[in-house]
Design a protein with these regions (language model features):
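Catalytic palm subdomain of template-directed nucleic-acid polymerases
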Residues: 1-25, 44-51, 114-121
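Catalytic palm active-site di-aspartate
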Residues: 1-9, 33-44, 60, 94-95, ...
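Eukaryotic basic, amphipathic alpha-helical target segments in cytosolic regions
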Residues: 13, 25, 29, 103, ...
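Residue-level detector of intrinsically disordered/flexible regions characterized by low predicted structural confidence
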Residues: 20, 30-32, 44, 140
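Short secondary-structure junctions
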Residues: 23-35, 66-70
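Intrinsically disordered, low-complexity coil segments
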Residues: 30-33, 46-50, 164
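Divalent metal-binding acidic/histidine catalytic loops
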Residues: 50, 55-173
């Protein structure tokens, strides 16, 4: 079962790969080219330069800061609980999802992750600040076209168990 495969190449290489996948698995393949959204990430290819820009800016637009009226901002070291705790954890999960295309927020999200179980008012203010940054700085990842011979890199998103007696399903093969 192949659930996701992203690739790039010239038309002939793409057709060869599609043919092989159809022979090995099924001809029920869905191909998306040039501009599409896949697993929440938008992909936009410049058909002149062949560069591909990926981003999650549409997802950022859907996120909302935590209402700071729910906390006492004069007590930044106070632990948050209840609904604020739940909102913090939810927004932190959203920020973690953004790390696929937002390298600019990695250190901040990493810092907030260390306090995921015991967030304080200060962390609520911090996560709101990171969200504001994301909303005001719409960025993503630009993949440049690299001409040359065909190469394939495969990164699996699931565990495999090839043989019935394999006990280590996470073995590198």
């Amino acid at each position: 079962h192949i659930d996701d495969l992203k690739g790039c190449g010239n038309d002939a290489a793409r057709e060869r790969l599609k043919k092989q996948l159809a022979e090995d698995f099924s001809d029920d393949l869905k191909e998306q080219l040039h501009e599409f959204e896949h697993i929440g990430i938008k992909h936009v290819q410049n058909t002149s330069t062949m560069e591909v820009y990926t981003h999650q800016n549409h997802y950022v637009d859907q996120l909302h800061p935590i209402n700071v009226d729910l906390v006492d901002r004069t007590k930044e070291d106070s632990l948050v609980a209840g609904v604020v705790y739940a909102l913090f954890r939810s927004l932190l999960g959203a920020m973690q999802w953004l790390l696929q295309t937002r390298g600019d927020i990695v250190p901040y999200v990493g810092c907030l992750q260390r306090h995921a179980n015991t967030p304080t008012v200060k962390h609520v203010l911090m996560i709101n600040r990171v969200l504001r940054w994301c909303k005001h700085n719409k960025i993503g990842v630009l993949f440049a076209h690299i001409p040359g011979p065909i190469a394939m890199a495969v990164i699996a998103d699931s565990a495999y168990k090839c043989e019935p007696d394999d006990i280590d399903c996470l073995a590198m093969r």
